[in-house]
């Protein structure tokens, strides 16, 4: 990724080094990456090499669960699944939704980005129309396809709860949840005029009423700004991107989210700031003001300056 032509490769390398050290120090059981590993469907060779190195270092010490986002080419990202290690789970196929990865005493439900036009037939649980053998396609919206995906999660969870399995459940959707704050470095995923999904969808899991014990945490992907989402009983959080990709993210502290669980629930959600190799700053003023009052804190930062 670049910022106005400047490579952010050194910032990515610094983050990976820090993350591996943190995972080792804190004894993290699993690293969840909810999509947008790359910025484009066909990433450059150096980005592929960097990702392979990061996955190799992380899977030596923990489990990694990785899904495809709207920026990623799902088929190309799936190539990482050939890294022969049981500690790496790469989920790019919507048909895999509803099958959890059991990690760290929790049930983790990976959910790759769902493009409505591509999955409204395959994920449909609507009755067949007329004499057709296929189910009726879902409505052309993110709300409809994510709802259908969550019903698959619900079906698996219901069966497990009925069998006495009360382990905490974590979902990994890649979507724009209503109430979230975007930045100008995300790509528009609007379909049918509606880009977002309602937060309470994660309470009901696509049905009318919540389960007695449904999801315990939602590790959402897509937005670059770290933030909690209100509107649901289950905690929903975007960890955000580890590096700022636009000047609209100035002032937002980058972080990762550490989620602690016990045998049945989430017990703690800790936000850990990421050390910044180079910050993002936005300055405004006359040329005289800017020269007369230099901001020492921005010496090593990428700076956007508006001269008035």
Language-model features: locations:
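Binuclear metal-dependent phosphoesterase catalytic core
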Residues: 96-105, 234-299
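N-terminal active-site segment of His-dependent metallophosphoesterases
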Residues: 1-54, 59-60
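Divalent metal-coordination and catalytic microenvironments
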Residues: 31, 36, 51, 69, ...
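Hydrophobic anchor at the start of a short beta-strand
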Residues: 64, 169, 269
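Non-catalytic terminal accessory segments
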Residues: 3, 90, 287-308
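His/Asp/Glu-rich metal-coordinating catalytic cores
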Residues: 43, 57, 68-233
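Short, surface-exposed connector motifs at secondary-structure boundaries
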Residues: 58-66, 299-301
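Glycine-rich phosphate-binding loop signature in dinucleotide/nucleotide-binding domains
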Residues: 23-27, 103, 157-166, 263, ...
């Amino acid at each position: 990724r670049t910022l106005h032509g400047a490579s952010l490769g050194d910032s990515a390398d610094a983050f990976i080094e820090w993350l591996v050290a943190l995972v080792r120090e804190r004894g993290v059981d699993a690293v969840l990456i909810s999509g947008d590993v790359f910025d484009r469907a066909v990433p450059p060779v150096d980005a592929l090499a960097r990702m392979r190195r990061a996955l190799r270092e992380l899977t030596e010490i923990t489990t990694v669960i990785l899904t495809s986002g709207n920026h990623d080419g799902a088929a190309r990202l799936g190539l990482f699944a050939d890294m022969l290690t049981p500690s790496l789970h790469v989920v790019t196929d919507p048909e895999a939704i509803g099958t959890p990865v059991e990690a760290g005493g929790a049930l983790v439900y990976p959910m790759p980005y769902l493009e409505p036009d591509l999955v409204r037939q395959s994920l449909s649980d609507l009755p067949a129309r007329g004499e057709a053998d296929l189910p009726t396609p879902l409505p052309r919206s993110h709300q409809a396809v994510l709802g259908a995906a969550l019903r698959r999660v619900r079906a698996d969870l219901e069966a497990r709860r009925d069998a006495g399995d009360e382990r905490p459940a974590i979902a990994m959707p890649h979507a724009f949840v209503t109430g979230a704050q975007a930045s100008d470095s995300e790509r528009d995923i609007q379909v049918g005029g509606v880009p977002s999904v309602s937060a309470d969808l994660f309470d009901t899991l696509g049905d009318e009423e919540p389960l007695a014990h449904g999801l315990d945490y939602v590790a959402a992907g897509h937005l670059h700004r770290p933030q909690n989402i209100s509107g649901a009983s289950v905690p929903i959080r975007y960890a955000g991107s580890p590096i700022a990709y636009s000047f609209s993210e100035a002032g937002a502290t980058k972080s990762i989210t550490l989620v602690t669980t016990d045998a049945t629930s989430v017990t703690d959600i800790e936000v850990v700031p990421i050390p910044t190799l180079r910050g993002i700053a936005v300055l405004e003023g006359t040329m005289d003001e800017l020269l007369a009052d230099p901001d020492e804190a921005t010496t090593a930062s990428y700076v956007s300056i508006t001269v008035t």
